[in-house]
Amino acid sequence: MQETEYINVYGARVHNLKDIDAEIPRNSLTVITGLSGSGKSSLAFDTIFAEGQRRYIETFSAYARNFLGNLERPDVDKITGLSPVISIEQKTTNKNPRSTVGTTTEIYDYLRLLYARAGVAYSYLSGEEMVKYTEEQILDLILKDYKGKKIYLLAPLVRSRKGHYRELFEQIRKKGYLYVRVDGEVREITHGMKLDRYKNHDVEVVIDKLVVAEKDDRRLKQSVATAMRQGDGLMMILDAQSESIRHYSKRLMCPVTGLSYREPAPHNFSFNSPQGACPKCKGLGVVNQIDVDKVIPDRELSIYEGAIAPLGKYKNAMIFWQIGALLEKYDATLKTPIKELPDDAIDEVLYGSDERIKIKSSLIGTSSDYFVTYEGVVKYIQMLQEKDASAIAQKWAEQFAKTTVCPECKGARLNKEALHFRIHDKNINELANMDINELYDWLMKVDEFLSDKQKKISVEILKEIRTRLKFLLDVGLDYLALNRSSVSLSGGESQRIRLATQIGSQLVNVLYILDEPSIGLHQRDNLRLINSLKELRDMGNSVIVVEHDKDMMLAADYVIDMGPKAGRLGGEVVFAGTPQEMLNTDTMTSQYLNGKMKIEIPAKRRKGNGKSIWLKGAKGNNLKNVDVEFPLGKLICVTGVSGSGKSTLINETLQPILSQKFYRSLQDPLEYDSIEGLENIDKVVDVDQSPLGRTPRSNPATYTGVFSDIRNLFVGLPEAKIRGYKPGRFSFNVAGGRCEACTGNGYKTIEMNFLPDVYVPCEVCHGKRYNRETPEVRFKGKSIADVLDMTINRAVEFFENVPQILNKIKVLQDVGLGYIKLGQSSTTLSGGESQRVKLATELSKRDTGKTLYILDEPTTGLHFEDIRVLMGVLNKLVDKGNTVIVIEHNLDVIKMADYIIDMGPEGGKGGGELLSYGTPEEVAKSPKGYTPKFLREELGL
């Protein structure tokens, strides 16, 4: 084959890559696999993608490059055959509450266009279909409806507004008009005429009064034109005999009430535009309100004793004097328990009073009484929530607030006008609320309900929407709705949305690199995902997938296996070829694929401790009033297809309930009826995949707390004592022992103006982070900088005789992180690695045997061998009497559980039910849902 048929990588040395060469066939689906830390991402993202991106940026002008990010050249000799590269990672980078599935995929933009062009408007006052006319149509209607009748032609000038309108009447009089209709009454305009300025008024000028002739009337035609001009496109007809009113407009207008709408445009249906957003919540669908139950948590107490949480116990302060004076009129005092106060009194304490309150002179030490208005505790908290309040004050005020659905738009995000445009009885929000499956079905059938005009307008728009929805269905996201917030999506979901968007873009000759797209996918949906990737390939693209999934590897055209181990012991290509060739080799990956190695099914399932937590009546999101038992002392696995309600049940209902109980967490759980059995546990630990820290200074040593022990060890050394060093001397975060040239970072950022910033090792400390004196203190010949540069495996050997340090480092090795460095920046760790650092930190703490651990997809980023190691760790926890709940799709984990809770049967609205529960063997026999079928195959039943 010619070289151009391959992407060739020569001499890659990024991170732990050992000067490797790799050959990847173009226009094929290639899987890069291997143990965690073996160099998969280093090859795919940090070498191939980084070089592709750098070359793309180099095509820009120097001026344009100045505004782009830092793009260092990866440490590689050369790469040939590279196409333009698009990376689709699993990071959920979008934290914007305004971003939704619909806006990300641009499907909502097409829906806005559809409603602006083909939507039918209805009045939000009367429910009548809105109409708009030309002047000729208005003339014909008047001749038809009022033939032979005496009518007044009116032009509306003021619509329900306060004012005396003296100047307006004078202007009308000067134009030669003699009459106006004010608040439904026709009046002659007199000199100096004015209205009550404090009341709302409707004012129309009488353009003409006439009897409608039987034939076309020139006077009527002129009067209609004048009325339209004076009324800015609106006019009214008053029947002199019946006094009934009809409205006419060139704009969209309700014929009954005269309500008019702006001409619809796509931005009128956008919740991110002032023209379309709900005015109350500004298009967010939720508002922040003060929660009275958080302000007054204990009604047994009096205000004096601290019943009002924001105020605390009584102190000599104006607000307490005001409340005391306010309560006097209810024959109560500050020492009256809240539960004995009348509701009116509590309302005034919270929301203030219009009355002026008398503060006695004896309280404030003045010669006379003092009168003030009292604005209430709620107003006081709201003031601290304002933008100009300090961050500390805002954070303090937040604890008394709760996020509730906007009372005006009911969570729809749009204003009343936008919500009253319909297509086949559905407004745009109702479509955005449907799950993608339901929406696709609705759009496939909607043609038969459209008028010929609507069909002609919407044919191309509908085609685009259907195509994009089909791609979302193909990647297993049928359970999502378009209005689902991007913030609430998992990494796997947001990655698959970006994948669907890319398939929809129809690009060719592109290299796509994906990071574990199967994350969060049930086995049922895996085949659809694989077919989507093949579709991307068949369009003429190259697809590289970093993946551990067995089905994905076997479906690939080409597999590259990195290894043989992780970290320093990895970074080599141990196999490259077709999946069939791989099955005949003896790499660790191939042994798991061909069955020589496997994760064994436990000989027996644990019985637990006989106690349980019962969660009853869970109704959050799509949960259908489920009652779930969590037997304690077991490894519990929560399963089900994507969107079936697993995360809602565990992460959004159970975990917040437990966090509120044990740690007074401010996160509110979703709706449920009751929970029983909390006395059977004394601690809950949620081990998630969020980064360890917000800065590059955070690392495994600082997060686990072992760095403090290491610093104390160095402080106790004779050399450190002679020099009088304290623990701060060995910290790179504070002045004293760190290198001040780079402030302890180990590198300096060089701004290149017209080129990307360059990160160079600090020329003073050479990347060691410390000044010259600090590393002179050595333990076993190693300085503290050397210790931070050690891998966990090396550190375990080094500190084998220091139990306090060894215990904390050993657990990092036990969870399969022996290859990472003690001082490795947390920003370079993957989500799965961060989760395991947190798990190790919890393992190193003393447990009580009554702890509940919650893990969401702990196998993310893990090879078969890593999963075996991780399961060993989790089993140790359970063997000590603790309970572990994992949300998981991986069958190797599911088959090792003591107890399974299977949710489903489908995702979204079709899910939310408890299908089966019990041991894997019991669940495998269930006829409901998809999990039992795959479990039967795995267990060999």
Predicted regions and their residues:
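Conserved phosphate-binding elements of NTP-dependent enzyme cores
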Residues: 1-941
